[in-house]
Swiss-Prot record:
One of its GO terms (biological process) is protein unfolding. ATP binds at I18, G60, V61, G62, K63, T64, E65, D266, E331, R403. This is ATP-dependent protease ATPase subunit HslU. It is found in: Cytoplasm. It comes from Desulforapulum autotrophicum (strain ATCC 43914 / DSM 3382 / VKM B-1955 / HRM2). Belongs to the ClpX chaperone family. HslU subfamily.
Length: 453
């Protein structure tokens, strides 16, 4: 999917996000430029830096969703973080390099799970052999037997043993042994009674004390009595974990993060300022200056190795109600050359959001109630009324964009969702009258709508 053309990327984003053509166009170009960079000769490739983007617009217009869908579309490592969570170096709080370490951690875990899925078949075969070893012990004595149900006859002849093993294998595969109990050893690392070391303050070095001491701590092996079916699952996961090549996983993760990582810096407007804060307030300009080397390209130490940030794509977003992008320090402004303003959503967009996307809100509620055997239907006038109410409440209270639809839909369908398991009438129609009945009293009362919707 990484070689998608800009028009194809926009088309894919249109399936989930309504409107915001300019923002979609900008991120599509940024993504295609990554593919173009990989086709450039080696001597010039490292010189081409990603064109970072600032998405400007009120809450609930699709800023975060555009970045998240973009990452899923391209299978890129993605991490979202609020810029306001960071503090200047020297203050208590998270340092800016932690977002690179977190992105690396997420990518390693994702690749590890994928590799475990790839070796699942082999792991299941190995787990099956271990189960058969438990069911048919080598020794004829009582110590060798691990079955806690009536024992299978232990045979000494190798040919008879092989024949018996194959019979057991067939029974195991047919599920005839699932209810038997076996004793298995489950290994875990011992945890100290008191946590002496804390990771606080060691993030800067990418050091994790638990990982450093992990091999020194004694293994904590517990013997558990479980049914064969559960033992099969436990042992399969155990074998899959042993089959994963962590060196390859780590190397691939570093490569993915460096070449195709995306970091979404939300609320960047909260750290925009002139750095004239006094007293206990942490300098906003200080956080910006800490962000600068990460965005422009530096090497960040992590427990998986050093990660270079030169080609990570940074997408920042903010409402910029009070501050302006020009309030960011000039050096940081220069690292975000593309700025896109997202438009506020109106009634027409709300109607489309409710019905058009692949994950449309109405489709979600229909699918949820179908699990109870209830068929939910929305008339066009009901959808129109819901959109009108969302616009009205946004204008009279706080404008939270499309998120208002979630609160309205939840309140609208509250009674249906509550009584769905018990109702005899399995087809329910939501029309304009139903919407008026459920919501108009709340909408008319501004105090109620402020707290409920």
């Amino acid at each position: 999917m990484s070689d998608l053309k800009p028009m194809e990327i926009v088309r894919e984003l249109d399936r989930y996000i309504i409107g915001q053509k300019n923002a979609k166009k900008s991120v599509a170009i940024a993504l295609r430029n990554r593919w173009r960079r990989r086709q450039v000769p080696d001597d010039l490739r490292d010189e081409i830096a990603p064109k970072n983007i600032i998405l400007i617009g009120p809450t609930g217009v699709g800023k975060t969703e555009i970045a998240r869908r973009l990452a899923r579309l391209t299978d890129s490592p993605f991490y979202k973080v609020e810029a306001s969570k960071f503090t200047e170096v020297g203050y208590v709080g998270r340092d800016v390099e932690s977002m690179i370490r977190d992105l690396m951690e997420l990518t390693v875990n994702t690749l590890k799970v994928r590799q475990q899925e790839e070796v699942q078949e082999k792991a299941a075969a190995m787990a099956e052999e271990r189960i058969l070893d438990l069911l048919l012990p080598e020794s004829g004595g009582p110590e060798g037997a691990t079955l806690t149900e009536p024992h299978l006859e232990v045979v000494s002849s190798s040919s008879s043993k092989s024949s018996t093993r194959e019979k057991l294998r067939k029974m195991l595969n047919n599920g005839k042994l699932d209810s038997r109990f076996v004793d298995i050893d489950v290994t875990g690392k011992a945890s100290p009674m008191i946590e002496i070391f804390s990771n606080t303050g060691m993030e800067e070095m990418g050091i994790n004390m638990k990982d450093m001491l992990g091999n020194l701590l004694p293994k904590n092996t517990k013997r558990r009595k479980v049914k064969v079916a559960e033992a099969m699952k436990i042992l399969t996961q155990d074998e899959a974990a042993h089959l994963v090549d962590m060196e390859k996983v780590t190397a691939d993760a570093v490569e993915m993060v460096e070449q195709s990582g995306i970091i979404f810096l939300d609320e960047i407007d909260k750290i925009a300022g002139k750095g004239n804060s006094q007293g206990p307030e942490v300098s906003k300009e200080g956080v910006q200056r800490d962000l600068l080397p990460i965005v422009e390209g530096s090497s960040v130490p992590t427990k998986y190795g050093t990660v270079k940030t030169d080609h990570i794509l940074f997408i920042a977003s903010g409402a910029f109600h009070i501050a302006k992008p020009s309030d960011l320090i000039p050096e940081l402004q220069g690292r975000f050359p593309i700025r896109v303003e997202l438009t506020s959503l109106g009634k027409d967009e709300f109607v489309r959001i409710l019905t058009e996307p692949k994950n449309a809100l109405i489709l979600q509620y229909i699918a949820l109630l179908r699990t109870e055997g209830v068929e939910l239907e929305f008339t066009e006038d009901a959808i129109d009324k819901i959109a009108s109410i969302a616009v009205d409440v946004n204008e009279r209270t706080e404008n939270i964009g499309a998120r208002r639809l979630h609160t309205i839909m939840e309140k609208l369908l509250e009674e249906i969702l509550f009584h769905a398991p018990d109702v005899e009438e399995k087809k329910m129609v939501v029309d304009a009258d139903f919407v008026d009945k459920q919501l108009m009293e709340i909408v008319k009362d501004e105090d109620l709508s402020r707290y409920i919707l």
